[in-house]
Amino acid sequence: MDCSMKKLTILDGGMGREVKRMEAPFSQPLWSAQALIESPEFVYQAHNNFIHAGAEIIIANSYACVPFHLGQALYDQKGSDLARFAAQIARECADKTSTLVQVAGCIPPAFGSYRPDLFEPKLGGIIFRTLFDAQEDYVDLWLAETICSLEELKCLQSVFASSTKPTAYAFSLNDDSLETALLRSGETVIQAIEHIVQSADNTNTISVYFNCSVPEVMAKAVSDTKAVLNQHKLDIEIGVYANNFTAIKSNHEANSALQSMRELSPEEYLAFAQEWHLRGATIIGGCCGIGPDHIKALSDWKASL
């Protein structure tokens, strides 16, 4: 096995379903922000659960710190403070562990997950900037999550232009497209990666992730990304963290109900992860419904490489 195949970083799993599993306060539309507001000890515990399972990067619990989940009034009053608190909790958990754990600041979708048709660039940029400013002092790297369109990507790039920290762009994929890797907008992964390549500068390290999509569509996205990067002779890391959901449709209403689960076992998820790694992914974790047991399976596998 060559050196590139031995390189692997373990990301954490899904915060929302983990705090729900622990019976923290959890309901729509607040989702994972409810524990942050009412019982933050559960957020500490969830981070620690993933760290103990072997996670080397943990993501701040700021995904739901947007008007879509908090409501406009609570967001205006506390959105920035909650995002800052989420980053502070993650920082504290990372610093208290005996192993090296990095904290990723989370920039989530501004208008709800999986709906590129609802994106508004001007207001989105303001929300992104608010969450960026709130977390900047506490994070080691940035992770823009569940990006569904090139329009959203471009808006995020303008926000991250002022940072010198490593930045990861995580795209959510069309769950029904197995032959062609598509963003939820219908734009191709190849188009997205070409845009990143053409717009990249040398001020900070860029990586490309794929998240919150079914595991079956990830391998093609990794292969397409690797092909574009090889064509441009670029060495950009690729990450994958899939969800444990059934397929999400294009008219999904993220606050209407909890998405149904499919209950992939740690062993089943690991089999997908091994394929992603073979195709070039070097950062692997889990999104919604992927818990500490799944992350431990990934960590144990890493130890065997």
Name each model-derived stretch.
Residues M1-L305:
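Domain-level signal for soluble alpha/beta catalytic cores
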